Amino acid sequence: MTLPIHFPRCVLYGMASAVWSILFLHILVGDTMSAADALSWSGGLIHSPAHRVNVMRSHHHEMGKELEQQHGGEEQQMQRDTKPAAFSNPPHLATGRGPSFVHADGQLDVSCFPHDKNIGSRTTEVAVVQVSSVQDCMKQCQSRPTCSHFTYNKNSKKCHLKDGAPVFYTYTGDMTGPRSCEHTCTDNCWMHSGNPLGTFQYSGHAPAFCWAACKGTAGCVMYTFQGGVCKLYSKNSVERA
């Protein structure tokens, strides 16, 4: 004959309290903590306080890993969204490394100088090469550290690479361009004092030619371009505006 088991009322209250604690923890932390973990944590009936601490540490560690992975994914997406679409390979023109501005179709930007005005340059040549286009001539200039500008003749397909300040003149079929069309300085960029290293009249030409003149002049670190007048200065004769 089996006798019924009777628990003291205090024991029944304790068991009910433990069950409610388990349910409360599971609802509070949602899916991030399983019912088994909640039971282990609240397990005053089963585990020690030290075990409960370890369970909570493990739970927080897993949550931290999830947040870190989420943040890393957002950062990578931001980098993809902000990547330039129109240009690539930022140039390092002062040292002769890298390309000029490149269009999305892979062609160099040669829009800063006229192609049909028969404009040549008398500046000393460092080399003459045979190429098929004005873009190829610009590439040849950029491949040589001392090249400041070039003259391309569309009839002869000859590319004349120059290493000094442009000295313009008229010659049939010629087009003269700077090392890069990137340099688009506006007027009043810099203030100056003292005497300039050189002064050039570049009225009607792009400011990039003033940059080319500075690159081709020893000691030049800065230039001004105002009203078509290009002035070159050394580091001892310029100060930031």
Curated annotation (Swiss-Prot):
Keywords: Cytoplasmic vesicle, Disulfide bond, Lectin, Repeat, Signal. One of its GO terms (molecular function) is carbohydrate binding. Contains six disulfide bonds. It is found in: Cytoplasmic vesicle, Secretory vesicle, Microneme. One of its GO terms (cellular component) is microneme. Residues 64-83 have a biased composition (Basic and acidic residues). SMART domains: APPLE, PAN_AP. It holds the Pfam family PAN_4. Residues 1-34 form the signal peptide. Residues 112-181, 185-241 form the PAN domain. Its main location: cytoplasm. The keyword NADP does not apply. It comes from the Eukaryota. The keyword Mitochondrion does not apply. Disulfide bonds join 112-181, 137-159, 141-147, 185-189, 210-230, 214-220. One of its GO terms (biological process) is proteolysis. Residues 64-90 are annotated as: Disordered. A carbohydrate binds at residues 121, 162, 169, 174. Residues 35-103 form a propeptide. Homodimer or heterodimer of major microneme antigen and microneme antigen. Belongs to the microneme antigen family. Galactose-binding lectin. Plays a role in adhesion to the host cell. Has a potential role in invasion of host cells. This is Major microneme antigen. It comes from Sarcocystis muris.
